[in-house]
């Protein structure tokens, strides 16, 4: 089976759904952010602070191309879709799933999370603007799932149905 790339904005449920799908399909799950942290030997927050977003995006593209294109669930960072080369790679080499969640619901989820470099609690308007600027890129995915106020079980049922279509 082709690899499944799970995309969506931060806080949409990519990691949670990736792990659940991994168990369901008996496929390994690989998190691009985690792999970048391992390879660079520093937290993403530190990469952003010390090297900037452009360097991080370069690491992200390199990591994406190094991952398996078969029999893996790949959970991506929220901004991976900003580069056309990444969107093209994922679409050509796997099934791309977009997990949508209302940005105001995400903001509530992330309110206390200090590990997200692009989420600033004080500036919800900028957060929503960033979300909207990525929307068209996310929508290029093969499969769209709205995770807003849904349980993992509901999301998984919908996702399995769409994967099997």
From Swiss-Prot:
Keywords: Amino-acid biosynthesis, Aromatic amino acid biosynthesis, ATP-binding, Cytoplasm, Kinase, Magnesium, Metal-binding, Nucleotide-binding, Transferase. It is found in: Cytoplasm. It is an enzyme of class 2 (transferase). Pathway: Metabolic intermediate biosynthesis; chorismate biosynthesis; chorismate from D-erythrose 4-phosphate and phosphoenolpyruvate: step 5/7. CDD domains: SK. It catalyses: shikimate + ATP = 3-phosphoshikimate + ADP + H(+). The keyword Flavoprotein does not apply. Mg(2+) binds at residue 15. Substrate binds at residues 33, 57, 78, 134. It comes from the Bacteria. ATP binds at residues 11-16, 116. Its EC number is 2.7.1.71. GO terms for cellular component: cytosol. Binds 1 Mg(2+) ion per subunit. GO terms for biological process: amino acid biosynthetic process; aromatic amino acid family biosynthetic process; chorismate biosynthetic process. Its cofactor is Mg(2+). Monomer. Belongs to the shikimate kinase family. Catalyzes the specific phosphorylation of the 3-hydroxyl group of shikimic acid using ATP as a cosubstrate. This is Shikimate kinase.
